[in-house]
Amino acid sequence: MIRPLPPELRGLLARGEVLLTVKDAVRELLENALDAGARRVRVELWGGGLKRLVVEDDGEGIPLEDLPLAVEPYATSKLQDLEGIRTLGFRGQALYALRQAARLRIRSRPRGQLGGGLLLAEGERVEVRPVPAPPGTRVEVEGLFLGEGRDPKGEVRGVLELLKRYLLHHPRLALALFAEGEARLLFPGAGLEEAARLAFGRLLAKRLLPLAYGAGGLEVQGLVSRPEVSRTRPDRLFLAVNGRPVAFPEGLLRRVRRAYRELLPEGHYPVGVLNLFLPQEAFRLRLDARKEEVVLSEEAEALVEEALLALFRRENLARALPEPKPLQPLSPPTASGLPRLRFLAQFRESYLLAEAGDTLYVVDQHAAHERILYEDLLKRVAEGPKPLPRPLLVLLAPEEEALLEAGQEALAALFRWEPFGPGRVRLLMAPAFLHPYPLLLPEVFKEALRGEGRSLKALLARLACLPAVKAGHPLGEAQGQALLDALLTCETPWACPHGRPVLLALKEEDLIRRFGRRSGARGGGEARPRPQEESFPEAPLPREP
């Protein structure tokens, strides 16, 4: 039942403009349809929606006696209190705003009602009468934003973008968009992967991994990109909470970046969609006209990070600090998830060119060697410190001596020592891989003590960088192949310990598309290039260190 909201709720909800564009109007009407349980929605735009806008659904419908209230301000059937928002629309403002801005026509019929109702409204004039009608609701808006010089094509683009976004969060909705009578979007409710092809393009959608994870009444589903796909902005990372599209909270974005830390270059973001299903106590919605901002509980944010890490482990893209174990013999497919790479050539004495199946790989030789050495160091550190052949004296400055009690993570994992007078300690144990370097040991101890590496992994990343083969160093075929074979034994071959990409992959179909050839027609047949929106830029090549 539609009812007016009490004054105290009206004041809290009266923030900002409701309708600024045709896209805003479509959003409000689409959310009403989804709240009504619609499984099919049809949107029609004439003159970009400025002349005429139609949204028709097969949802529950509005009873005849409630139609006049539907176009009154702050009248809604969806909200009892601010703590119980469970629908997409809740302010009771949308139809009233349309009534004030344009001519409004609503035809609706609940499934249990014999006949339907028709409402005609413009300004303060409202007329309601019974009419025959199919189940559901049809809203027609005429003359929206008249005389404002709007661009019809721009309005259509905005609506199309909006509908693709909503399909990522409601992939079982059958949705159609027509502009000037021409079909611009026909989606049969075919699921999330098909919705992703619409939103991201076919090529990018093929590089997304399905995500499904739940714990403690919290659940996340979605699609997220593999390491070879990234953006320098989080503008292709979409979030919804209980079906409501919302902006990514900063806290959650930090969690996502942390999960991808060893897979993506610094400053890069993944691509994809996350659909969160949470109880009311796990989030708080900001009450403004756009309804796009949300505050998530710590448990909800942690769930997403756990889900991503579990996915990466399952796909062999990432692994926590490994237990010591012997390396397994190399056999395709490898533990890394990569096929065995065949060395082709070295380019500019910095990059290795390799192939596997229908894919060409470009490998940064320094980043690859860093990753190999880093994972070897991780395994050796997991064995714990070993007694030094003879104790080693280390001199400490007063500020360094004061840090001994802080118990730095890297310090405790790498060394055992004992006080040996003021400003001195005697090293008793250290990782076996450091034993041959007695001159380096004091510096590593001090760096771990000062926490300059920030963590054990960061310190090991610095140690791996020093001996790694540098850009500009020539490698022969045997050396190049050995480096590639060693890379395939890594748990995370996609990125160096600092987060820069190790390799880029270019599939044969990408070459065919970019050269404008027909797929499979290697004899020289030409074809028109595919539309630009189907392509997606690879991550940029890493700079030389």
From Swiss-Prot:
An annotated Gene Ontology molecular function: ATP-dependent DNA damage sensor activity
Entry GO CC: mismatch repair complex
Region of interest (Disordered), residue spans: 516-545
Protein's UniProt name: DNA mismatch repair protein MutL
Cited InterPro entries: DNA_mismatch_repair_MutL (IPR020667), DNA_mismatch_S5_2-like (IPR013507), HATPase_C_sf (IPR036890), MutL/Mlh/PMS (IPR002099), MutL/Mlh/Pms-like (IPR038973), MutL_C (IPR014790), MutL_C_dimsub (IPR042120), MutL_C_regsub (IPR042121)
Protein function: This protein is involved in the repair of mismatches in DNA. It is required for dam-dependent methyl-directed DNA mismatch repair. May act as a 'molecular matchmaker', a protein that promotes the formation of a stable complex between two or more DNA-binding proteins in an ATP-dependent manner without itself being part of a final effector complex.
Superkingdom of origin organism: Bacteria
Keyword Lipid metabolism tagged: no
Keywords for this protein: DNA damage, DNA repair
HAMAP family: DNA_mis_repair
Biological process annotations from GO: mismatch repair
Organism: Thermus thermophilus (strain ATCC BAA-163 / DSM 7039 / HB27)
Paired cysteines (S-S): none
Family: Belongs to the DNA mismatch repair MutL/HexB family.
NCBIfam families according to UniProt: mutl (TIGR00585)
SUPFAM superfamilies given in the database record: ATPase domain of HSP90 chaperone/DNA topoisomerase II/histidine kinase (SSF55874), DNA mismatch repair protein MutL (SSF118116), Ribosomal protein S5 domain 2-like (SSF54211)
Pfam families: DNA_mis_repair, HATPase_c, MutL_C
Gene that this polypeptide is encoded by: mutL
